[in-house]
């Protein structure tokens, strides 16, 4: 029996399903019921929602713990008193990363989409693999691909929170971005950079480090950079045509990496995908490099890009009709919001943009108040919900009202959850985005239903 404390998280639920598929009995606790936990229950995994040691099954082999579980958890302390083996989620992923050639994809932003895209291209090419994705990939309607002992590789999202990705031993490591985030853990930006450098330097000596050319990565490992300029692999001629993003890839260095599959990297023209935004073009560059290194040919790369449907809550177009366009996005950092709103502005340039934002964490809102205000001001209308606290207590002076004061959009307002649907109905928006990492996603089905009519 494998027991999960915090089984409803996107990463924990993937591991729970992996162990269940590999013949283990699985059970777990989470604070609240969600679509993820409901899905686990339909798959035969027992989940309860009360922090009560009496509800823990007997005969547990080990417990998998998420960092989100507080130190005063009754169940956690009960298991410790009983000397049950407790391992962090990252330790389990670390173990799996050592059993197969692992592709670990990290970055403060972009890692989930890139992980899902690499997984999809490899599956398109017929590769045998397992994958652990930090979101629901639309092509497979899942956050996990369950392989077997014959897997050629395992693709995993590498989470920087709580230094989790330092447990991994990748064959290929990818870093999509490094911004100041999780400062409650790291303290400052330099410590974030140091941790990412420690991560890439855990890459095996015969492997590859792939990273965005703008990043302060320092490694002696074999590496390759990508970006829109000043990189080894560059995206050019980016445009949106008939609902698709089109771009070319140019190899900008003479070194053809003759000792490995990177020698097959070449200039590619007229690549197409359904994702929008320059940030997603750059995510695609990383995916193309990784896939080429793992032996995927050009035809399968083109087909994989063209058929990739994206990830839920990542520029997720939920409604597109003659009256309304509704996009849902997980963005919860100023740079992510800037990328998402800029993409919406570019693709739907003739529409007035309304954004509903739920700030996530008091510390993050405090640390990036000015950045949030600047990014949100890209919208014509801003509607702010209260800050979603997650694991935190309130901080004096850190409120949605304080953020609203700094936003320069002429049309802006505060809104309670109870008012949200009526306000959206009254606005009748032509282009609206819901943005945030809290529980704003609970409103998505209702907003979708209202605007789809």
Roles of regions detected by a PLM:
Residues 2-7, 435:
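Conserved N-terminal Rossmann-fold NAD(P)-binding element of oxidoreductases
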Residues 373-430:
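C-terminal helical cap/extension that packs against the catalytic core
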Residues 21, 29-48, 138-141, 396:
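N-terminal beta-loop-helix "entrance" segment that forms/cooperates
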Residues 11, 15-18, 22, 255-381:
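Nucleotide phosphate-binding/pyrophosphate-handling subdomain across enzymes
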Residues 29-30, 48-51, 87-91, 132-134, ...:
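Beta-strand->loop->alpha-helix junctions that form or flank phosphate-binding loops
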Residues 18-24, 41, 54-58, 67-222, ...:
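Phosphate-binding loop of NTP-binding sites
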Residues 24-31, 209-213, 354-357, 380-389:
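Short internal beta-strands
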Residues 46-59, 416-424:
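Short acidic low-complexity segments
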């Amino acid at each position: 029996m494998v027991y999960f404390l915090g089984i409803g998280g996107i990463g924990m639920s993937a591991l729970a399903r992996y162990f269940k598929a590999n013949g283990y009995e699985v059970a777990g606790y989470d604070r609240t019921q969600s679509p993820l936990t409901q899905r686990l229950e339909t798959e035969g995994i027992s989940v309860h929602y009360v922090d009560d040691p009496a509800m823990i099954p007997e005969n547990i082999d080990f417990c998998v713990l998420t960092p989100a579980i507080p130190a005063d958890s009754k169940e956690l302390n009960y298991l410790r008193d009983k000397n049950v083996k407790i391992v962090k989620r990252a330790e389990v992923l670390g173990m799996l990363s050592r059993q197969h050639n692992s592709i670990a994809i990290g970055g403060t932003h972009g890692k989930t989409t890139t992980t899902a895209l690499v997984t999809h291209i490899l599956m398109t090419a017929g590769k045998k693999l397992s994958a652990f994705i930090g979101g629901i990939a639309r092509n497979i309607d899942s956050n996990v691909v369950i392989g077997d002992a014959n897997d050629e590789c395992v693709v995993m999202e590498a989470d920087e929170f709580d230094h989790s990705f330092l447990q991994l031993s990748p064959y290929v490591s990818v870093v999509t971005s490094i911004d100041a985030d999780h400062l409650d853990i790291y303290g400052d930006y330099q410590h974030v950079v140091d941790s990412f450098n420690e991560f890439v330097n855990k890459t095996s000596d015969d492997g590859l480090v792939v990273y965005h050319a703008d990043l302060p990565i320092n490694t002696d490992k074999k590496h390759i950079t990508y970006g829109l300029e000043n990189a080894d692999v560059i995206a050019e001629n980016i445009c949106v045509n008939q609902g698709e993003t089109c771009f070319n890839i140019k190899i900008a260095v003479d070194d053809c990496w003759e000792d490995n599959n990177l020698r097959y990297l070449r200039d590619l023209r007229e690549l197409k995908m359904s994702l929008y935004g320059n940030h997603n073009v750059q995510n695609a560059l990383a995916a193309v490099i990784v896939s080429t290194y793992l032996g995927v040919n050009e035809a399968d790369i083109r087909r994989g890009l063209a058929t990739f449907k994206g990830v839920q809550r990542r520029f997720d177009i939920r409604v597109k009709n003659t009256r309304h366009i509704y996009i849902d996005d997980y963005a919860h950092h100023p740079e992510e919001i800037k990328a998402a709103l800029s993409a919406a502005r570019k693709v739907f340039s003739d529409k007035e943009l309304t954004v509903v934002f739920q700030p996530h964490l008091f510390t993050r809102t405090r640390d990036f108040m000015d950045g949030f205000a600047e990014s949100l001001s890209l919208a014509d209308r801003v509607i702010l919900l209260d800050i979603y606290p997650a694991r935190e207590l309130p901080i004096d002076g850190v409120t949605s009202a304080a953020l609203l004061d700094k936003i320069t959009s002429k049309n802006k307002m505060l809104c309670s959850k109870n008012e949200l649907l009526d306000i959206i109905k009254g606005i009748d928006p032509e282009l609206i985005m819901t943005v945030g990492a809290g529980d704003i996603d609970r409103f998505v089905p209702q907003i979708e239903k209202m605007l789809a009519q």
